[in-house]
Structure formats: structure tokens, C-alpha cells
């Protein structure tokens, strides 16, 4: 079962479960405060020296079946080459968790995402499933990660998908999502149009 949620709602519930073993996979530099175990392909043990950190070395995750009560995968799946295998691994090590993904708009805006992200996502609210395809860069990116994080605070529902799952992560891969025939939008053209419009507006005044 997969459905929409919010990170604040998830965190509030996790705070009420101090006995749970919670994994933050792909924790990066800003792990979830509720996680009892952190994991990443980078060796961040020194950075997280006061927490239980595990370095991921192989495709198969170094954890036992159903080892965790909850697993957090925030901005991770878009980086994974073998999407199907990784999702199966999440289902193997836990029965429930939280998934956070950039929306297609959010992904296209961020400059640093241009080469790092492999997958593009939308969410089917009728069938409650993730729709994934290989990423297509339609909009020339012009926003830095730090600015993107700030924008997420204001326009979170437009830039981020927040999902919770139990027992099974429903998804399908659909390359029609790519809109490959769409014309690429140049940032310079956007600026020119904006300045042109601004100048015309000022002249009218």
C-alpha cells in the first residue's frame, strides 16, 4: 500500500515510537533525527560519529530481512540505476517506510540534479502508485540546491513527492512520462522574455 503523506506527519509519529529500529538509507549530510541507523554509499562515519552508521558497499543492502521497523529513503531512488532491485530491497528489510522524491518540476529546476539524477517521477493518485521514467531535462536548470531547499519550504507540494508505504511499494515504469518531443526551454530565453515584458510594462507606466 502506498499513499501520500507529509514529512512532518511522519516525524511526529516516529517520535512516538522510541522502541523502533529506524533506518535512514542514503542519509547524506542531513539525516533524519528519528533514525537509529544511518546508511550511505559515502563513508560518512566521521561526520555522524555519535550515531550508528553503516557504509553501503554492494547492491544488496547489508541488512537482514525485516531488520527494521521503518525505513526512510529521502531523495535516494532518483539516483539508483536499478530501480526495481532497490525497491525490492526496501521491501525486504522492512514492512513500512517513507519515500521522498523530487517532482518532475523540482527535478528540472535544480542545477546540480542535471547529471546526478537518473529517474523522473510522478504519482498516480487513482491507482496509488509511483510512475517512473528515465529523466528528461526539459527546462534548463537555474536553481542551486540551497535555493531549492528554501523554495521547497514554501512550495513543497509542487516540488516534492512525500509518500508512505506499508508491505508493498506500488510503482510502474512508463517512458511516456518523458515527453521526449517537448521543446527544451532555455533559461536565457526565459530571462529575455521576462526583461522584455518588464520593459514594456515600465514604458506603459
Roles of regions detected by a PLM:
Residues 1-18, 190-204:
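Long, low-complexity intrinsically disordered regions enriched in Ser/Thr, Asp/Glu, Pro/Gly
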Residues 9, 15-106:
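Conserved SAM-binding loop
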Residues 84-92, 96-205:
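S-adenosyl-L-methionine-dependent methyltransferase catalytic module, highlighting the catalytic core
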